[in-house]
Amino acid sequence: MGFPMTRKKWCLIGAAVLGLGVAGIATSINPIAERYVAPMVQEQLHNTVRGTIQYDSMHIAWNGDVVLQNVSLRDENDHLVAAVPTMNVSMKWTSAPSILMGNSSGAAIVSTITLEKPDVHVWQLADGSWNVNSLLESSSKNDKKSFDGNIVINDATGAVRFKDGNVHRLSNLDGNIALNVDGMTKGALNGLLDDHSIAVNGSIDMNKMDDFDLFVRAESVDISGIMNMVPSNKNLSITSGILHDVKAQITGRDGKYSMSGNLAFDGVGGTYKNGSTTYQIGQGNGKIFFQNNTVLITHSGWYVN
């Protein structure tokens, strides 16, 4: 005499079968990943970066992803650029046959690199360029395919240092970057800049890194730290102040910057030179609308000595 199967028993059997199936897939993927993929990922990380990458450990997850712990990235001068507690490298398994047959480079198998809680250090060099400009190696002409995967950033912190000594702190930074080492890289990031919200998206030509387009929305920015990026009259020097509700597009072409957008400002101070006379200005406030070299200031007030 048989007994009817209850829904609960069917669910338990289904879960067991599913678990065995997943375990079977994981069992088949892991030996391949251990033998071929882990060394390939290790090689590509070193080949892609001008500098050094070190990590405490590397292991293969159940799904074949490569997981690295306590990763550090240093530039060619051995300066720390990033420290990442956990880096997860996901694969495009459909690219494996092409790579094994020699039709694609090893970089083609990397789909997504996820950085968990990275701490990033970016600084401006004396010539106005940035330490990260030369960090990535372009692929050689013999490569069948360059790296064009996604980089996902979760809960990053960091610092941006300008050549004049100003430092801005980043925190709670999340984003996604579609990286193409030999072409146009696009991305979007949002988080906190000096404890105020900021969102940035745009693109940069990796073959000519002076060519970029950035769109910025910021709640509040200390003006003293960004003046060396803003086109301004040579007779005007701004040394203090806060920008609010910033909406700006910043474009770089051949090392020259142009900006358009609008913002509000207050507490602005500095100097203005008119001929042989220099004026002290302070407590400036108002709104600005700007387009390249055209600037419109409204609802504005200043103290002038």
Feature-to-residue mapping (PLM):
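Beta-propeller and related beta-repeat scaffolds in trafficking/envelope systems
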Residues: V160-D182, N190, M209, K234-L243, ...
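Secondary-structure transition motifs
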Residues: G51, N70-N176, N207, M229-L236, ...
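Transmembrane beta-strands of outer-membrane beta-barrel pores
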Residues: K117, T157, L193-D195, M206, ...
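Short beta-strand segments that buttress and anchor functional surface loops
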Residues: N70-R74, G187-D194, T298-Y303
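Residues on the solvent-exposed faces and adjacent turns
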Residues: S57, N70, M91-W93, K117, ...
